Structures are given as C-alpha cells and as structure tokens.
C-alpha cells in the first residue's frame, strides 16, 4: 500500500469510528437517503409502477422483444434464455449466461448469476411471481392491440433505466420516419391478410392481434376480414379461405423456421 493512500485510509476509518454530533448525524442520514434515491428510479410496467436500480450492471432478460431493444440501445445483457433463431442476436446469446428458457427459467443458474434486475414480458411473464422472489423484476409486456405505441413506451422505459434516452430518441425518430413512408406507400394498394404458418397449419390474425395490429393500424392497410380472432395464436384457416378472401397482400410469419 502506498503511504499516502495508507494515511488517507486511516483517516477515513478514524472518522467513521468517531462520535458524530446530532446535527451531523441528521445530515449524514439525509445524504444516504438522497444517494439511495439517486441510485433508483420509478418506471411504469405492465403491473404498475416499480422501483428499479438505475443503470444496473447485472441484468437477466426473459423477453426477446426487450432483449432486441436493449441490444439496439447498446446495453450489455449478462444473462438470458437459451438461443432462438434470430441471426443478429446470436452474439448476445453467445456471450450471455443461459438462465433457462422463455417458459422455464433455470432458477439455480439465475441465482448463480445474481442479477440486479430481471426483465420479463410476453409469454415469459408467466414466471413473474417466482422470478420476483429472486431479484428485482419488471414485466414489460407490450399491448398486442397497440404494438407500436406500447413498444416505443417499452423502449423509453429501458432507455431511462440504462441512461440511453438520447439513443432511444434517435431510434424513435427513425421508426416514425419508416412508418410514415410505409403508410404513404400503402395508400390505395388493396387489402391485406396476416398469416402464421406452423408445419401444415395456417392461422390468420385479426386487426388488434399481436402480429397484425401494426400492419392494419399503424400502416393503415385494410384487412380482408374484420371478424378474425385477435387472441392467442390466431384463428385457424384453410387454403380455401385464403382463396375466397383473395387478399392483395399476404404477410406470412414462418413459425417453424423461428422456433424449429
């Protein structure tokens, strides 16, 4: 130990052991409270407002949408689920500790990682109660019927937590510009149908569903069928149905390619 640092350390220890006048104790308590307050912030979640650590270093994520957003914001995620087939997220999965799957968290692995904050949402939020017993946990599930606005709100929340507000504002401006361009391009171009394909099964999604709400709402492409189901994994349909409706545009999500 260098002499100067040694004497400084001794001075700090002596000061800590010395009795404080009542007034100084009050000031010290107020300073500690202010410091603790500065280290946390209150953010909106799907379960109401929550107090979270500000700019936590050890973060575990059980929501792929949040993982995508955090990666785009340049936030390091130390732990997440087993990999999924999203090419640009593979570097994240390779570096991060695996703490289970979206539907089955590995609580032993999570405890070993010792996160300061756990972020969940969507299907992963089913494990919220148990996750919250292990660490501070927030549910950032987006509103399926309002994906764009809800997604931007999620991005804003994450940006506040990690001090990335400026970057988030730039991303929002880019997103807004893309939506405006696409909405203009879609005007008068017919009607659309959003489908999900799993093997030989085909499902169609309603205007307020998780896969179609932004296409029909934010882009403004009219649907070929207003009666389609909005909940869950869509409404099973046949090829005859598709032929009968005869959409001008078909948007297909290949679920088999995504999850295997």
What is each model feature region?
Residues 2-7, 17-64, 166-195, 255-260:
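Bacterial Sec-exported substrate-binding components of ABC uptake systems
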Residues 53-56, 63, 67, 71-74, ...:
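Extracytoplasmic/secreted envelope proteins and their assembly/folding machinery
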Residues 58-112:
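A short, structured surface patch at a secondary-structure boundary
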Residues 60-61, 104, 121-125, 145-152, ...:
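Soluble non-cytosolic domains of exported or imported proteins
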Residues 82-86, 124-125, 141-146:
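Short, acidic/turn-prone active-site loops that include or flank metal/cofactor-
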Residues 92-140, 186, 191, 197-260:
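Binding-cleft/active-site segments that stabilize strongly anionic ligands or cofactors
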Residues 133-200:
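Extracytoplasmic substrate-binding proteins
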């Amino acid at each position: 130990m260098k002499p100067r640092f040694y004497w400084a350390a001794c001075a700090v220890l002596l000061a800590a052991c010395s009795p404080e006048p009542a007034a100084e104790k009050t000031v010290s308590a107020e300073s500690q409270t202010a410091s603790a307050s500065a280290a946390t912030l209150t953010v909106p979640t799907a379960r109401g407002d929550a107090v979270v650590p500000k700019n936590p270093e050890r973060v575990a994520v059980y929501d792929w949408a949040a993982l995508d957003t955090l990666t785009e914001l340049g936030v390091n995620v130390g732990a997440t689920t087993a990999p999924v087939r999203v090419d640009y997220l593979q570097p994240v999965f390779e570096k991060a500790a695996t703490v289970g799957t979206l539907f089955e968290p590995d609580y032993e692995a999570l405890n070993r990682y010792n996160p300061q904050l756990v972020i969940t949402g969507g299907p992963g939020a089913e494990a919220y109660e148990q996750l919250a017993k292990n660490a501070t946990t927030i549910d950032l599930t987006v509103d399926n019927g309002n994906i764009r606005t809800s997604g931007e709100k999620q991005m804003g929340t994450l940006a506040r937590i990690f001090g990335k507000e400026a970057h988030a504002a730039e991303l929002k401006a880019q997103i807004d510009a893309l939506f405006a361009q696409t909405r203009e391009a879609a005007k008068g171009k017919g009607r659309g149908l959003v489908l999900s394909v799993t093997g030989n099964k085909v499902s169609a999604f309603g205007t307020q569903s998780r896969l179609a709400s932004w296409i029909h709402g934010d882009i403004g492409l009219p649907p070929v069928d207003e009666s389609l189901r909005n909940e869950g994994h869509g409404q099973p349909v046949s090829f005859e149905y598709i032929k009968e409706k005869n959409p001008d545009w078909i948007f297909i999500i290949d679920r088999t390619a995504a999850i295997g």
